[in-house]
Amino acid sequence: MKTIYLIGFIGVGIRNKQYQSEPGLIKVGHVGINFENDNRILGFHPTPEAINAIGGAREAMNWLRNRKDGNRLDGALQDDTAIFERAYELSLRGARCTVWQQAIEFDSDTFERIREQAYNWYEEQKLFPYAFPLSIEDIEWDNCATFPRRLGLTLPEASGQLQRYIPHLQAHGQAWKPKGAEE
């Protein structure tokens, strides 16, 4: 058996003045996937090009927060290892962003198929519609928490709401530490 990890944290908050200089994903929270024996954590979120096209990070956040209109941006899998490492560092300093992981085991063939698909999409920067959780049923979207379903992973919680999702990682997993972090 081989293991795929769902890794995630609840953000420090978009209005918390102490963290205003932090990247947006630290503020809102994030979920990524990691494959056994791989150092990278892949996360799904808007591409830099999509963010720049709408006028920058603040404008992108405002656009996505308008959920009633079904606003979406182009998103892709990206190497977000540094984001999870930063959340871990902040949690050690008292920020409410403990990083959690849940291990999911697969037979070798299924693991390799999922891993190959994820890395193909990552390398080609395949675009998918990214949105904050929408209740509009006829609009296709994913966010970081729901994207793993595209790879055939069963989600611990399907709403895409990190306030609901992360407690499932916590209940069925363990706290995450970067490779090389002190025990």
Residue ranges, per PLM feature:
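Non-catalytic ligand/cofactor/substrate-binding and regulatory segments of enzyme domains
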Residues: 1-139, 173-183
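Short, well-ordered, aromatic-rich surface patches in folded extracellular/luminal domains
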Residues: 149-150, 158, 162-164, 168-169, ...
